[in-house]
A protein has these predicted regions:
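A generic structural signal for alpha->beta connector loops
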Residues: 13-15, 35, 92
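A generic local structural motif
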Residues: 2-6, 25-28, 50-53, 83-84
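Inter-motif core of Ras-like GTPase G domains
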Residues: 9-10, 21, 28-46, 53-66
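Conserved nucleotide-sensing/catalytic segment adjacent to the nucleotide-binding pocket
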Residues: 1-19
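Generic recognition of short, well-ordered alpha-helical segments
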Residues: 1, 33, 52, 56, ...
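Histidine-centered metal-binding segments
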Residues: 125-138
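Conserved nucleotide-binding/hydrolysis micro-motifs of P-loop NTPases
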Residues: 23-25, 44-49, 69-72, 101-104
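Canonical P-loop GTPase G-domain recognition
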Residues: 70-127
């Protein structure tokens, strides 16, 4: 839906387009928007049960941003259980711990975005756009 709307539009000049879900971890996991990557933002305040409670969302994720990590000292969160849950549902769990308050992880998040953009641009130049129809994606 989003992908189709972007074809032939002025949006082609964008390097990144973020589409945020409706605010929960269950609804948007089953919809294909034509996206190139899936990133799940999981706040440490949500608890360690979320990967096992919403496995589809995490299984489809290319990356999990574990957010609000500056709050960890104030929470009763079992980080090992959370990481175990991610390992059980994700083919290759990739996690970046992030704090907007302290800035921890922001450089890693930006580097990951740039690396993914570069890979996708190279695939597009080689004609391997990756989602079933031929054209350039940069």
């Amino acid at each position: 839906m989003v992908h189709k709307a972007l074809h032939g539009s002025a949006w082609r000049e964008l390097d990144y387009l973020f589409v945020e879900n409706v605010g929960n971890l269950v609804c948007p996991a089953v919809y294909d928007l034509g996206q190139s990557v899936n990133v799940v933002a999981l706040s440490v305040t949500e608890g360690e049960d979320k990967p096992l409670k919403y496995p589809v969302m995490f299984r489809k994720a290319d990356l999990v941003l574990l957010t609000k990590i500056d709050l960890l000292p104030h929470l009763d969160l079992d980080l090992a259980a959370l990481e175990d849950g991610l390992a059980r549902v994700m083919p290759v769990p990739r996690v970046i711990r992030l704090s907007a308050r302290s800035g921890d992880g922001v450089a890693s998040w930006l580097a990951w975005l740039e690396e993914r953009r570069s890979v996708l641009a190279a695939q597009a130049r080689a004609g391997r756009a990756g989602h079933g129809h031929p054209h350039e994606h940069v």
